[in-house]
């Protein structure tokens, strides 16, 4: 982890102003900054695990179960017509934060993000709407996830 605290560990511990949409015993889901589309969320384990090789099978299963719940909330509350799941492990794969994370990206009829893009630096333009839209989306997802 180096000398800097892990950004995702800080978020999982509640020491960030990131919009958390789900906080469970082992996992936290929060809105990605910048988002590819409104509702783009990251699922991370609360404990620091660097990559796919570091997490326990039970943690991987829990992350996928939460991704499914998020996908339903994105469809039902935000009007998503599809969803992309993405997990990058290792620098060559585009992992830029060394804490396991699973992207859950809702897709809309009018979005322009390429579904097959390889994410390192965001190849998309963040959606318009600003803080008010981010709060609306976070509130809708939090409500749906209970």
Question: What positions do the PLM features span?
Answer:
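HIT superfamily nucleotide-processing domains
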Residues: 1-146
